[in-house]
């Protein structure tokens, strides 16, 4: 052993210092009737630079907003000295929690005294198992530990084993209600796990009578139009293709206001018993909306699914991966985007709780869901980790904007060209004697349109571009000048084909 000493280990990421630019600016929208302590009905949106910021605003993993399930055991017969009572609770994944064993002792001559002794044993172990108990005239009320939500409400999780003539009546757990804050915390945590230097706006809005998704406009306006992607978590009603059409309409309105962004839609599919019955989205034109149906299968996300009864999805991880990517990069890029940290998202599931290891989840099914334009996690033979199948949009594969990276790239180009051309708006245009645009005017306008596109080329976000202005435009009559911009994208190696075989010689 080394000599005694005091050492320091410097952490990183705690300050949440953001990156330059705004490509990583993101948002999450939740719907709920109750708000964390840092929010109010007049302040439903907050800006976070780290998970610590969110926790300071009341989004903590303390289950303070949870209603813990409670069950009871009424002692009806005190039995004889030496009789025993053992109480156990079965938790998620079959974990059995032993709350202790009571042995009847002399002097405990009433049901109240016996119940008090059992309560004392349970409460003595609270620091270990988290359960608490109380006694009212021989009725022992057992309160679940934090974090179990609705899980204990069904089945027969409490078991009581007695030896001897001691007797009682068992009532199973009821009335557990899950923590919404735990869901918020999970997705925010996952976002910053994938993009530690991200900027995240979080809005928690009242559950509407009918969804219009106007909250996208609200949060984008709050952020002065800087948000590039928004994740929408909707668990109060089921996944609906019509939602994505409504979201697309809001996104188009934002684009018209020079505040373009894309959306990731994560809704409740817990009631979908057969994942193959999901709707084919190729027939829709919601090209700026990406539907996320994946979920962690054995860690925090999976536990939240069991304790809430709601689809949790990998919305936070997907949003974070997109924020970490350059605008042209696919979040399916194997070299860069391993979504698993070895625990979270290591075991894969769909957001209806069905594990990928289930016999029904075949390669043919995964291919079909990919072709149906859904986003989920997958594995590769010989490669550790978990990876998104792609950033599919809810539209036909033939659409120019069939993937989120297509949209993010063109939106960045639009923002850049807009900002550089804006000084020329309502400015004078020098014309030739025949009313056509002069060479000087064309050169000036082209010079305005190009700087941000040049930077995108240098940053390998686009391959090339061209700017064209028709000199014969009738500007005097129309008051409008058309500047055409053509962009050559960066490619994405979605498929790699390798012809291979033997030969007698190499040519």
Description of each model-found segment:
Residues 1-24, 51-96, 101-300:
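Polar low-complexity, Ser/Thr/Gly/Ala/Asp/Asn-rich disordered segments used for subunit assembly
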Residues 26-32, 228-233, 466-470:
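Short hydrophobic beta-strand segments
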Residues 439-463:
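Short, hydrophobic/π-rich interface segment
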